[in-house]
Amino acid sequence: MKIIKRNGSEETFDIQKIVVAVTKADKDNGERTLTDSQIEDIAEYVEFKCNKLNRAVSVEEIQDMVENQIMATGAFELARKY
């Protein structure tokens, strides 16, 4: 699966980038809000949704999906910082 970066170039989807970004935002938030398992679940859900679209997905679309999943856990402050 391909993603479309902000500069218009395409790159292969890498689930680890979501895990790293959410983990970093969570750590920067002070006390951890999400468990590693919750972060993995978010990343896997986003990967599943992107695959279902059957097209290249923009970074912005992925960010929106991640934010929505973070908010679904009740971690609204973290979603804002992400």
For each predicted feature, which ranges?
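Long, C-terminal-biased catalytic regions of enzyme "large/alpha" subunits
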Residues: M1-Y82
